Amino acid sequence: MSNLLGQKHILPLCLLLPLLVVIPGLLSGSQPVAWLFATDIGQTVLWQIRLPRVLMAFLVGALLAWAGVLIQGMVRNPLADPGLIGVSGGAAVGAALFVVLVASGLALPGWGQTLLAFGGGVLALLVVLKLGLSGQSLQAMSFLILAGIAVNVLASAVIGLLSYMATNEALRQITFWSLGSLSGADWLWVVTMALALTAGLLFWPRR
């Protein structure tokens, strides 16, 4: 009976916890809370800067958690994550390549970094699947993890080469990207992330 009551409280608790994080995130900052609601500039800061960043952080965290769950189910390993099978490394290579190309004078749109990072992650995943799924059953999962580790090592080497070739400013941008930043968050990115999360939930094979 106690286990049943505990399970019933899991969903409300999961819905409540994000609110406990989002609200302090909106109200914390260099300016007092009253300033956010008393001036036009404060309203702009609240609705156009702070709220998109907080929602973006929430959605990105949800997507990362979802990706981790899917990969853990795929490889049947509760310790697996996107970094283990090379997806994160491939995405980092794509993003670093964009920074180096722009620093070299090549004119690329701002969304090109996202596109190259996505393409790098997909390419790394395809390589890992090709190398790792040559076996059968449990052995195939072991091969998959080993292939992911190999791709990660290769990605680290490529990032090291790109960092060596990069200018000081480009190297700083690569470092900031690898650390993660929400400074460029806006409502367009929030909607995009929400659609990506919704699509993942709808098309997830429930097996």
Model-derived features: positions:
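Alpha-helical transmembrane segments in inner-membrane proteins
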Residues: 1-207
